[in-house]
UniProtKB/Swiss-Prot annotation:
NCBIfam families to which the protein is assigned, alphabetical: uS2_euk_arch
Organism from which the protein derives: Sulfurisphaera tokodaii (strain DSM 16993 / JCM 10545 / NBRC 100140 / 7) (Sulfolobus tokodaii)
PROSITE patterns: RIBOSOMAL_S2_1
Organismal lineage: Archaea, Thermoproteota, Thermoprotei, Sulfolobales, Sulfolobaceae
Full protein name: Small ribosomal subunit protein uS2
Domain of life according to the entry: Archaea
Amino acid sequence: MSEKEKEGQLSEEEKAELQKSEKGAVIELLVPLDTYLSAGVHIGTHTCTKYMEKFVYRVRPEGLYVLDVRKIDERLRIAARFLSRFTPENILAVTSRPYAFTPVTKFAEVIRGRAIVGRFPPGILTNPQLPNHIEPEVIVATDPRTDLQAIKEASKVGIPVVAFADTDAKVDFVDFIIPANNKGRKSLALLYWVLARQILRERREIPPEGEIPQRVEDFETRLVE
């Protein structure tokens, strides 16, 4: 376990609090709390932008910002509901983060969307003269910083952008933020798996509590030996 992961560990009291709403009612998360925590979706950075402050649960003595799992879960639900309204093949998921290559590819496969991993081809959204020009209806981005080219192009042509964002994120040109650890390998796998499953639930392609055949591990980028 890394030092950052140790800093992000929660006490039993904190875990109990995160399973209740602000009014004290017990809430049901999309996956068990411990599943979220073990994947590290809540682990932020040692900096926090003004916009992201509202998603922070705690600031550790070491200066690590810890995200509120309840808000991550809530935002995943809202994003899935929004994305379910689009024609599947018009949803484009993008990432330039290597740890997100597999999650994004599997996500697009499960929801029957499209994916661009690695370097985003400049002008692909804004220049109709390019042979590889595409016209998606919505973009799902992994990181507002590293996927800025795609996000800026989408903004220019009026394509809405849903993006995962850590505590240090600048969210210009992003229409809807899902606060989360968008740098960790296991975190990215779980986030994209949950989002994919919830989109299928919202489309009613699977029951409200139905499962998909793919496992979270199938969404995880493998480390090179």
